[in-house]
Design a protein with these regions (language model features):
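Active-site neighborhoods and metal-handling regions in enzymes and metal-associated proteins
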Residues: 1-409
Length: 409
């Protein structure tokens, strides 16, 4: 954690302070909240899944780090549970200066008044982790507005570009955690296929996948898509409540989240256990693009080219089978990007102008969607960029026609 914090310091000007907020649970009703989702940049620096917290970095004559965390009263613990104490947080984060969040406002006032000269000297620059300012309900956005109003002389900078650079390259520990999430996803798909053999309801397949996640103390990485027949032509179909027709294809786009890191896998299954000839033709087309683009990935290649080359491959193969008449027609049947970075976020932040580098984790997810035939096919894998090429982290999850049909035997 300290190495990551040091990289934030390295990106900061002298006489500056940076704030990274953990976020808070959003109210659902008078006495309920939606599940808390920690700010992944805060987690990246602290490894804490803790609400209402603030990491503060001050760069002046020396570099100071302090972490403000909530402290619950005994009465509140009876309702909401026990939070980690300062000693436990110190052990987890390797940070020594842990403070009660209740003191943050007074601390903040002291930074930008005459008292600052005695402690830190004049501070001229403020760095904020505010990537989406339109979400004005978030504490950090409100905080940003107050700073601009009360201290207009300050130079305010965004940290988002720094986190993009840092989080794009995964450490060995991060890669291992992503592998764990993929393995749980694989187990969930195995159970889902067994369920599909006897139950032709989308919601039953979803339930079987959720069971495996809960069994492994994992969460859904995103809203699971179980889309059969014509629903598979809708990219973000999440109703998962229709009957699955005989000889339909079932597109399953899903993933487990383990210790905040995500898997993102898509497999497409024949509801009867056997592909029809037309389904085989289209499925093989998508599979070949998936496989060829995984082979295409190497350090030094452009992420923009990755998307464009994949689209061109789809068009070439669609032309050969007569699905389209011109390469431009592919947009009628393929209308999303070929992939994205994966990590703490399912769509991990990145600089799209960066070339591929060792340690990046990408998805490769070509698809074909033919509304008039009620067919949607997508095949998605999670790929690690190595020093010489790539490794398919989800290779163990069956995806060839023979391998998928064997699952039903």
């Amino acid at each position: 954690m300290l190495t990551r914090i040091q990289k934030i310091f390295d990106a900061m000007e002298q006489q500056s302070v940076a704030y990274v907020f953990s976020g808070d649970a959003i109210s659902k009703t008078a006495d309920q909240h939606f599940p808390f989702q920690v700010n992944k940049n805060f987690f990246y620096l602290t490894h804490l899944n803790l609400h209402q917290s603030v990491l503060v970095l001050i760069k002046h004559k020396k570099e100071d780090v302090m972490l403000f965390v909530p402290v619950r009263t005994k009465e509140k613990e009876k309702w909401e549970g026990i939070l980690p104490n300062f000693e436990q947080i110190q052990q987890e984060t390797q940070l020594s200066d842990i403070r009660d969040k209740a003191t943050f406002e007074a601390f903040q006032t002291s930074l930008f008044t005459t008292l600052r000269d005695a402690t830190y000297g004049e501070l001229k620059h403020v760095y904020l982790d505010v990537a989406r300012p339109e979400r004005s309900c978030l504490e950090e956005v409100t905080f940003s507005h107050e700073l601009k109003t009360n201290y207009p002389e300050l130079h305010i900078h965004a940290l988002s570009h720094v986190f993009k650079t840092l989080r794009t390259i995964k450490t060995d520990d991060e890669i291992q955690t992503i592998k764990e999430a993929i393995n749980i996803t694989h187990q969930g798909l195995n159970r889902l296929v067994k369920t599909l053999q006897d139950n032709k309801e989308e919601h039953r397949l979803h339930a079987s996948f959720l069971y495996e996640l809960h069994k492994n103390q994992a969460k859904e990485a995103f809203d699971t898509i179980i889309a059969s027949g014509k629903h598979a032509t809708i990219l973000h179909y999440v109703d998962n409540n229709d009957h699955i027709e005989q000889n339909a294809l079932v597109l399953c786009d899903l993933g487990a989240q383990k210790n905040q890191y995500n898997a993102d896998i898509t497999r497409t299954y024949p509801s009867s256990g056997v592909f029809t000839e037309r389904q085989k033709q289209l499925y093989q087309l998508v599979l070949e693009v998936n496989q060829e683009m995984i082979e295409w990935i190497k350090p030094g290649k452009s992420f923009k080219d990755f998307k464009e080359v994949g689209k061109q491959l789809l068009a070439e193969k669609a032309l050969k089978i007569g699905l389209i008449k011109t390469p431009e027609d592919i947009s009628q049947y393929y209308y999303h990007g070929l992939g994205h970075h994966l990590g703490l976020d399912v769509h991990d932040p990145c600089d799209y102008d960066m070339v591929l580098q060792e340690g990046m984790v990408l998805t490769v997810e070509p698809g074909i969607y033919i509304e008039e035939e009620g067919i949607g096919i997508r095949i998605e894998d999670d790929i690690l960029v190595t020093n010489t090429g790539s490794i398919n982290l989800s290779e163990a999850i069956p995806k060839t026609i023979d391998a998928i049909e064997s699952l039903f035997k």
